Amino acid sequence: MSTLSLKYVALGDSSGVGVGGRPGGYVEYLFQRLRRTRDGVGLLNLAVSGATSATVLSGQLARAQRTSPQVVTLGVGINDLWRGVTPGEFESNMDRLASGLVSTGARVVVSNLPDMSLAPVARLAAHFLPLPLIVERIGAFNAALERVITRHGLLGVDLYAPSHVELPAGNFFSADGFHPSDAGYQRMAEHFWPVLQRACEAAPERPRATG
C-alpha cells in the first residue's frame, strides 16, 4: 500500500543554512510550519553557505532532481551580487536552474533579493562596492529574476519591497551585519509562507511506499 507525502527540497545559500541564527534558517521555519499543517512532510535541505547561482547549478541541482521533489524553494543571488557576477551571467544560471527544477514536475518557489544596500555590511564594503552600485546591481538582478520567473512559470517571493522596512530594523541582522538573525529568518519565512502554500496546493501527488 502507499500513502501520499510531501517532499520539500530547498536549494540556496547561507540563508537556508541559518548562518547567524538557528540551523536551517528560513527553510527550517518553513519546514516546521509545514509539519504542523500537513502529514508526511519530508525535507531535503541542500543549501550551502557561500553558494552562488553557479555553484547551486553545479552542486545542488542534480541532487535535487534525483529526489523527485514536489515543492522546491530556491534562494540565491546575494553572493553573486557581492562577487561581481554580471546580471547576464546570473540570469543565464538562473534560467538553467529553473529549467532543471521545472523538469522534475515540482512547483518551484524563488525569492528575489532584498535591498542589501541597507545592510550594515554594505557601508563597510563601500570602498570596493559603492552603495549606488549595490542598488544598481540589485535592480538588475531582480529584473533578471522576474524574467526567469515569468519564462518558467515559477512562483515568486518578494523580499525586496518589505526589506526597506525590515532591514533597517535593529534586530533583522546578526552581529556580523550581513547574515540575518533568528528574527530576520522568521521574517523571511513569513514572506515565503503564503507562496509555499500555493505551491503545495498545486504540487504533484507522488505515492510513498509504506509497510
Language-model segments: which ranges?
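Gly/Ser/Thr-rich beta-alpha loop segments that engage phosphate groups in nucleotides
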Residues: 14, 20, 49-52, 79, ...
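Active-site-proximal substrate-binding core of FAD-dependent oxidoreductases
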Residues: 55
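Serine-esterase "nucleophile elbow" of acetyl-processing enzymes
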Residues: 1-50, 59-68
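A short linear-motif detector with a strong N-terminal bias
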Residues: 23-25, 52, 135, 158
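Alpha-helical cap/lid subdomain in secreted, periplasmic
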Residues: 58-211
